[in-house]
Design a protein with these regions (language model features):
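Short, structured coil segments at secondary-structure junctions
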Residues: 1, 79-80, 141
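Short, well-ordered alpha-helical microsegments
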Residues: 71-74
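Conserved phosphate-donor/acceptor-positioning beta-strand/loop module used by diverse small-molecule
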Residues: 79-100
């Protein structure tokens, strides 16, 4: 459809983009040069992330910004036309992330592994995201909010997304 993907994680942790893309394609042995000894241990700050995202938005007429909330600068928010909110309960969200990270990092994210504490903290963080937190982040958004059921097949939700994006063009 010609949209440029802006995944927020890639901006906080730019060195992991190749690894994330490979994982989406089912490849889990891609090696990256991380900023710290442990992947995801050294992040850019929010100001740097906002600037980098704003630059990429300015460079791409059509983009999809992927992330948990939309607490962005007015410059970024003013360009967003639709929000797709993939709704899934916290327990399922944590289960999916845990499964994905175990596939991606193996024993490193299990108890005793060098990434265990970091990933455990991350799972606790995402498990604590409430629907209210997302609603609060959307409070100033003026565009359409499209709710997607995260328990439905990916193909079903993708069809909804495709139809909504076609309305923009």
């Amino acid at each position: 459809m010609g949209y440029f993907e802006i995944d927020v994680e890639d901006y906080y942790f730019p060195e992991q983009k190749e690894s994330r893309q490979a994982a989406l394609e089912g490849e889990y042995d891609v090696k990256c040069n991380y900023l710290g000894e442990i992947p995801y241990s050294e992040a850019r700050n929010k100001s740097e992330v906002n600037q980098a995202i704003a630059r990429d938005i300015a460079s791409h007429e059509k983009y999809i910004l992927c992330g948990v909330t939309i607490n962005w600068s007015d410059e970024i928010l003013s360009t967003i036309q639709k929000v797709f909110w993939l709704k899934v309960n916290s327990a399922e969200r944590v289960r999916r992330v845990k499964r994905r990270e175990e596939k991606r990092w193996g024993e490193r994210v299990l108890a005793g592994g060098d990434m265990y504490e970091q990933q455990d903290s991350f799972r606790n963080l995402i498990g604590g995201f409430s629907e209210q937190k997302v609603l609060d982040s959307l409070s100033d958004f003026k565009g359409e909010i499209v709710e997607l059921d995260g328990t439905l097949p990916i193909s079903t939700n993708m069809q909804i997304v495709k139809e909504k994006l076609e309305q923009i063009n």
